[in-house]
């Protein structure tokens, strides 16, 4: 047979094979999902002391599929835009054949909205191969046919129908999550934000990998640090400081009064993102002949509370530039905390600065005749109670 005849015979065989494939495909049902861009929003509120098992960013997100041409998108993969910069996620930037079955570590930078503090967390990314048509040529929702592997891996798994028939995976699904161990690394409460960007890549016969879609996720973590809600008194190192009422004689010499200021800043475990604070104070006393709302200190040698053995005073706080009375055993609600001016402070046990809300106290002792009081040292406890709205989140 001449070379020409051999070529002609080969051409006929190929044509017949192609026709057989075409007829078989047309006989089977077809399902197609074209890969498209994603712009997801993830908002989660969590308690820093007890974070969830994981925060899901993408949960089995489809990279497209075509049951009639399974290898068209069945070998897709996902890559980062940078291998080193965590601003939008750092991980491999090129697809890899037969990559490790281990998840991909995606380094992503989170920034706290109020303080500007940053932290890089390691997200976990996996992909699985799926089929959308079974061995009986029946369309199905999507069956996983591979273990979870690195997201940058390309190549296709298949389902074994019989010794003579396999079904190639026709698509992939992406899962990205923040594991609980990484959530525990967030140093403070507050609003922590990040933006993840992943490119969906298609494998071509030319061994090129064009970008066919972009998967974006705007992530917002509302982190409440309930273990660190506290009243911060910058001037004192003790949790129960001693405050002098600063009683002074007036010019006439027979009367006394006093004013004492205490720097106080309230930390809500949320970088002052609470909508309101409830503040109350109490001296724990039941005293006769005392004006409503007043507090008292008692003579150390006589705790009866008698008029001549006690000194009465008033308490107020300053919030958002306004002086607010704080009556004994009453609760005052401070509104609009998240819109008020905060103060950056360093608190024990917290590795980065946080924002508290300034609410300085003023203890004012009205004028009284000193001769009407017994001489000696006067003292008592003043208990401040602070409850932010963040405590109920």
Regions found by a protein language model. Give the residues of each.
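Bacterial N-terminal signal peptides
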Residues: 12-20
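Bacterial N-terminal signal peptides that target proteins for export
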Residues: 2-12
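Outer membrane beta-barrel transmembrane domains
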Residues: 297-354
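N-terminal small/polar-rich segments of proteins
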Residues: 27-113, 178-318, 360-377, 381, ...
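Exposed beta-sheet edge/beta-hairpin loop segments within beta-rich domains
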Residues: 135-139, 143-195, 201-212, 341-377
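A surface-exposed loop-and-adjacent beta-strand signature within N-terminal beta-sandwich domains
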Residues: 99-165
